[in-house]
Regions:
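ATP-dependent small-molecule kinase phosphotransfer cores
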Residues: 57-117, 123
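ATP-dependent NMP and nucleoside kinases share a basic, alpha-helical "lid"
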Residues: 110-153
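Walker A/P-loop
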Residues: 40
């Protein structure tokens, strides 16, 4: 068993390094965490600096089926409008995605990963466990901003950080968070960690 320790403050990544990384393929990633804790920001940083392709589970679900399910009920005119309003109906979205994945817990995840490196924002514990069982993801990353932001209600999110290979704290500034994200991104693109155990990156 490999024990990974990451000291973010001592890892320096230059612009030229990150530009070169855009030509290197990412492993398949799952980004987890409570609402508004920085999951999309994590993926956006890796996209902009290292070429990661990603799609949030909510955006994919809106495009694939939730817009059609809810457009009459809430008067949505586009999938984008449906997606933007998800914050007002999180429990309903949770139930719809759970139903969509009822016969295959990894159904939505596999659809997203057909054209992306990363799935952002899975919310159901059974779906995470189903994806782990099928080996859908190479690494799972948890983004944690719990020192400055509230946790999410259990009726729309029932996952905890115990599933993660990496736990990344986001309780400081955006600049600090960006350094941590780039450090982990560099490790994931250039090294292999076949038996990583969960660690806290702070």
């Amino acid at each position: 068993m490999l024990v990974l320790r990451v000291k973010i403050i001592n890892i320096m990544i230059t612009n030229s390094n990150t530009n070169n990384m855009k030509n290197t393929k990412f492993p398949k990633l799952l980004i987890l965490g409570n609402a508004r804790h920085g999951k999309d920001t994590f993926a956006e940083i890796l996209r902009d600096h290292m070429g990661l392709s990603f799609q949030s589970s909510s955006q994919a679900a809106a495009d694939i089926f939730i817009y059609d399910e809810l457009k009459v009920k809430y008067g949505y005119e586009t999938p984008e409008e449906c997606f933007e309003d998800r914050v007002n109906h999180r429990a309903e979205w949770f139930d719809l995605i759970t139903a969509y994945n009822s016969e295959d817990r990894s159904r939505l995840a596999k659809s997203i990963l057909e054209i992306n490196d990363c799935y952002v924002g899975m919310r159901n514990r059974k779906e995470v466990e189903g994806c782990i069982k099928e080996g859908v993801f190479d690494y799972i990353i948890w983004v944690d901003a719990s020192e400055r932001l509230p946790l999410e209600a259990g009726d729309s999110f029932d996952i905890d950080k115990s599933y993660a290979h990496f736990i990344l704290e986001n309780n400081g500034t955006l600049k600090e968070f960006t350094k941590k994200v780039l450090a982990i991104g560099g490790l994931l693109k250039y090294d292999e960690f076949p038996n990583v155990i969960p660690v806290m990156v702070d």
